[in-house]
Each structure stands twice: as C-alpha cells, then as structure tokens.
Amino acid sequence: MTLGSFRRGLLMLSVAFGLTRGDLAKPSKLVNCTCESPHCKRPFCQGSWCTVVLVREQGRHPQVYRGCGSLNQELCLGRPTEFLNHHCCYRSFCNHNVSLMLEATQTPSEEPEVDAHLPLILGPVLALPVLVALGALGLWRVRRRQEKQRDLHSDLGESSLILKASEQADSMLGDFLDSDCTTGSGSGLPFLVQRTVARQVALVECVGKGRYGEVWRGSWHGESVAVKIFSSRDEQSWFRETEIYNTVLLRHDNILGFIASDMTSRNSSTQLWLITHYHEHGSLYDFLQRQTLEPQLALRLAVSAACGLAHLHVEIFGTQGKPAIAHRDLKSRNVLVKSNLQCCIADLGLAVMHSQSSDYLDIGNNPRVGTKRYMAPEVLDEHIRTDCFESYKWTDIWAFGLVLWEIARRTIINGIVEDYRPPFYDMVPNDPSFEDMKKVVCVDQQTPTIPNRLAADPVLSGLAQMMRECWYPNPSARLTALRIKKTLQKLSHNPEKPKVIH
C-alpha cells in the first residue's frame, strides 16, 4: 500500500459520504454557494466556505461537484492527484465558474513507499467509521431510490406539460404556472425548468432601481416577466426569498407570482435573478402618485392587499399546507398593482416563518432591516420580542395601517383629494434616520393625520377607524390581518366596477 493511494482513499471516502457538506456543524459565518451534486435539494446552499470537487472514478469520465463546507477544512489543503482535486473558496458563489484539472497519471515507482506496518495500525482505527459510513450510505441509497420512484411520475407529468405549453402560442407562462408542473410546493417551476427559463429571458428595459438592485422588464417567448437583479450586498435577501418561494405554498392571487430563481454570469460577474410575474402598473407607491381613486377602487386596493397579508400570516395544515409568514418590510413600494386593479404583496427577503407543530421560528440569516418610516414603535424602541412570532405579525399590522393611510389620502370625497405623500411626511425628513422616527413615534407618540373628509363617507369612515386600530401602541391590541380582511370585505359591498380618475 502506497502513501498516495492511502491518502486518495481517505479523500475519496470524505467526498463520497458528504463530509464537506456542513451538515454536522454550525458555521460561524455563512456564505452562499452554487450546489450541484446528487444530494443538492436546491441549486444553492450555505456553509462556511464553497467547494468544487473534481473526481475521476476508475473507468469513468471525471465528475464535477459543487457545494458547501463547514468542517474537514484540511481537505482544502490537499494537493490534486490523478483521481481527485478539491478546491475551497470563501466568497459567496465563488465556486460558480471554477474549473479544475487532475494531475497526470503517475507510475507506481514515483510514489514513496509507506511503512508496511501502517495498514495494520490504521486498519482497526478506521474500521468502525467505515462500517458506520457504509451503513449510512446504504440507508441513503434506499431512500434515494424511493424518492426517484416518486419523482418519476411527477417528472413525466412535467415533461408532458412543458411540451403542451410549447405547442400553444398564447400564454406559455400561464400554462407552466397554472398546471401542476411545480416543485411540489405550488410556488414555482421545477429547479431544472427554472434554470432553463432564466437562461431564455431577455432583458428589455429597466423599470426600477433601489438599494436592493434593479428591476427589469424581461421577455420570455414573447411574454413579459419581471426580473429582479439583486446587488451583491443584498444576496441574503435573494437567498431568503428564493428559499421561501421554493419551499412554501404561496400561490395566491394577492401574493406576487414566482416563476424562477437563478444565478447567471454577466460581464464576468455573478448576478442573482428572481423572475416573477410582471405588472405594468408597478408598485402601489407609483400608482398612487399617478392616480386619484374613487372610494370603490380605494377599497378594492385595500381589500386585495389585506387578503394577501392574511394569507401570509395564516398557517395552513396538511400536505399542501404552509407555515405562518410575517413580511417584516410591508410598505407601498412592496405592494404591486395588477392589471385588474387588485394588489399583490411582493419582496419576501426579510420574511419570518413559524410552524406551530414544531414551534420553530425561522428568522433567516439576513442582516438587512426593514424600512424605518414604516417601523412599529416596539421595533424603534427595541422592545420587540424577537423570539415571539406574533410580535412580527403585529409590526406588519402597524405598517399595513400606514399603507391604508396612503390609499385614503388619494381617495376623492366630495371632489376633494390630497397629493400623494409618504407617512409622517410632515414630521420627519425625506430620508429619516432611526432616531428621527423613534422621537416621532415613540417619544411624541405621533401617528399620521387622518383626513377629516373621510368622516363624510360612511364607508371610508370605517377605513379611518381601522387605521387607528392598526396603530395601537400596545401591539397585542392591534387588529389581526384576518379581521382587517373581513371588515374591509364588508365595507366593500358595492359591486360597481371601480374606475381610475385621471
């Protein structure tokens, strides 16, 4: 037994049993990495570093695997051999475009001989871990075989649905998303189809920019889609939003429709794309600056937004269920207006999930904070209970009350309407600091002034009362999203079709 072959055996064993995947240790600082291997459940993963492994098994072509590592960092220091090359890097997605090579095949005489007693010494030491690993591998293969059998039926269904969509000239995207061709969550396309769609999207025009990056209108087989391109500093938001859309049942008329998520290389840099339905009216913030509203349209916008928030907040049980979700960055810029003049909620990059069955609160790993202008008093004075999911829902309700106020200002009553203004426009600067908002909301206990003219309309007076109940200083006294939804639906009893007043 030679030293080279002994080292190869240990390295191959480590790779074969996934010891660099980071499943056994909690990394202190996480990076996002491309994940391409049989055990990848998503096209990305998180770990302490990114890995690329090039392996050549006897009689086969070399195989490339990409993933994450959180332990066994000594493998990163190994030199390449004719069978294995293992590369580690420490920036997000640094393993996306790395190419490796194997050493030229060596003759046995080139490898130094190892002490003949070494196998006798190491044999008993290695026997137990090897047996345990082999048992684990056997169990994994059995489960993998069962999963493949289950997936076979869904894959066949997906293929037929994709062909059907290709044959129909109108609304290919609709055929994809309205069918059962999903990841199983009902939230988007299968991962391989997501990647295919992303590579077929052509960017047409930039329709928005912000601290997160840019939003483009794209074209896919003649249909418009929205492409949100995240900046490198906001990659955790992309990761979180992709994670939620791919694991949670979020198909709802009043939640922005998800299509695909992918990493692409443009101009020698990695771009993070989130592809969603395109809504030409843009955000509610943009819509309210351009349009004034009749009372019925104002209620239509409010009811639909409340329906989306209620769907996020509720936990649905069963095989097609979903955990409860709190948005944490609700504002008029993160609410879109659809062509039917209903709202849908977007941007889940800060969302928090909670499951009652496991009592697990999934906060994510995003250092970004919400928008200061829409922060609830308990967030500003740092008294929020971060270990309690209800606390996050209560902050959403505070912010939703501010969105209702923005809608109410642009509603025409007796021929009177105000210009669009953001909440607290007359109390804080255009870009308020944390301290600015804390003084106004917590110290002075101010809330936006509700227009007196709302009292002249029996329906909108109910909307005004709802705002006040969203802004109670005591978070637990605020309305729930479900109560807001039901109350608004009662107020909106008039079936007259809404109109936009220019």
From Swiss-Prot:
Leader sequence residues: 1-22
Binding site for ATP: 207-215, 228
Compartments (UniProt record): Cell membrane
Cofactor(s) listed in the protein's UniProt record: Mg(2+); Mn(2+)
Keyword Kinase assigned: yes
SMART domains, alphabetized: GS, S_TKc
Quaternary assembly: Interacts with TSC22D1/TSC-22.
Protein name per UniProt: Activin receptor type-1-like
Natural source organism: Mus musculus
